[in-house]
């Protein structure tokens, strides 16, 4: 596995929150990692400035502390106590240029652990505003023509465009309503099957099952099945609704064999395979209680449950049937059980090759017993006397 690094950082805008204070502003960054995954993170300007100060302390030469002419780390103005919305808007251009310059620095800086840790997803980045908040956060997006050319150094992030196949009525303030035919840009594809999208000045979460790519009905980013399976644990009970789904109780262990982007993964429980909501699963060995607290809504609807679907494509999506999953899974399990059985070593195994080599080596010849005359000529006087007495 290669080293972890960031390919690109793009500023999307800022969010004005009214909890805990009126002046709580967070900037939204879209971070593209080495595996092409894109994550949205939120950072306050004071946090960014503290990160900047630590970075300068770590690299004093590149920060110009010794010789100002050697400075390559970009400048960042200190925050003011009463920065309001106008200041937040002004900071956007500064932060866009700052992030672009960071990505163009030598790898010892642009890929240092301090920078990577700062832009990793935190638990707060995943928290959605609750419906009982008296005043919702206000989101201000960067204009598309307001991006600095400095971000072109590593290549800009192009958001994918999808089309709504049916009407969707939002069920919470953090979601976004859709009408059939609406075209949206996808900012983040969550494994839960809820995607964060934007349409003009609106932003919100949408079930992936209500969206289709413009160029093909198939989702090209869906990975291939992995019949070896990954161990997961159910963190919330679920009762199957469709015949191709699996019911699980909280705490039951399963193997995930296909991670689909619509949030409905194919799992294996003993020899049974079927669909299960990914947001109710957690990798084995990880903190279950924290994952349970992050469940803010129900599982997204499946495509098969959506009524009045209108697709622009002539053919439907290519999907493996449950029979295909079951056959391939059984075949893999049988092969794994055969390999696990103890038995004679195969002809090509290293142990058998070593045994064959030992058998093929010629044994050393036993030398003949010397004659009595030869012994008398070459032995000592005491040996001669013993031989004479024996005769």
UniProtKB/Swiss-Prot annotation:
Residues 310-319 have a biased composition (Basic residues). SUPFAM superfamilies: PX domain, SH3-domain. It is found in: Cytoplasm. Coiled coil: none annotated. GO terms for biological process: respiratory burst; superoxide anion generation. Keywords: Cytoplasm, Phosphoprotein, Repeat, SH3 domain. InterPro entries: NADPH_Oxidase/PX-Domain (IPR051228), NCF1_C (IPR015039), NCF1_PBR/AIR (IPR032136), NCF1_SH3_1 (IPR035756), NCF1_SH3_2 (IPR035757), P47PHOX (IPR001655), PX_dom (IPR001683), PX_dom_sf (IPR036871). GO terms for molecular function: phosphatidylinositol binding; superoxide-generating NADPH oxidase activator activity. Its main location: cytoplasm. Residues 1-126 form the PX domain. Residues 286-391 are annotated as: Disordered. Residues 157-216, 227-286 form the SH3 domain. GO terms for cellular component: cytoplasm; NADPH oxidase complex. The modification Phosphoserine is found at residues 304-305, 321, 329, 346, 349. PANTHER family: NEUTROPHIL CYTOSOL FACTOR 1-RELATED, SH3 MULTIPLE DOMAIN. May be required for activation of the latent NADPH oxidase (necessary for superoxide production). This is Putative neutrophil cytosol factor 1B. The lineage of its organism: Eukaryota, Metazoa, Chordata, Craniata, Vertebrata. The gene is NCF1B.
